[in-house]
From Swiss-Prot:
UniProt cross-references to Gene3D superfamilies, sorted A to Z: 2.30.30.30
Designated name of the protein: Large ribosomal subunit protein uL24
GO annotation, biological process: translation
Subunit structure as annotated in this protein's UniProt entry: Part of the 50S ribosomal subunit.
Record-annotated membrane-spanning stretches: none
């Protein structure tokens, strides 16, 4: 499944319980079309004690959300935006903001 965002992109959640939150993409899972965003869709995981973590306990971590629920955030126009692709003269393919024309 094609995913329109990449790792380290800043995105805005456009639907669901975390609607309106902004965060950085930590991981992209193209096989399932999901992304993990920092500070979004937090779940509690019950961790058993092991050699690395002797204490164990309940930890809070980010769970994956569908990539269709996030939109790329443009730093120039300070809004969530759709993107288009543009070929530069040197043959490089870049992503462009549809609202202001800024390249990502």
């Amino acid at each position: 499944m094609k995913v329109h965002v990449r790792k380290n992109d800043t995105v805005v959640v456009i639907s669901g319980k975390d609607k309106g939150k902004t965060g950085e993409v930590l991981r992209v899972i193209p096989k399932t079309g999901k992304v993990v965003v920092k500070g979004v869709n937090l779940v509690k995981k019950h961790q058993k004690p092991n050699r690395q973590n002797m204490q164990g306990g309940i930890i809070e971590m980010e769970a994956a959300i569908n990539s269709s629920k996030v939109m790329l955030f443009c730093e120039k126009c300070k809004k969530a935006t759709r993107i288009s692709h543009k070929l530069l003269e040197d043959g490089a393919k870049v992503r462009v903001c549809k609202k202001c024309g800024e390249t990502f």
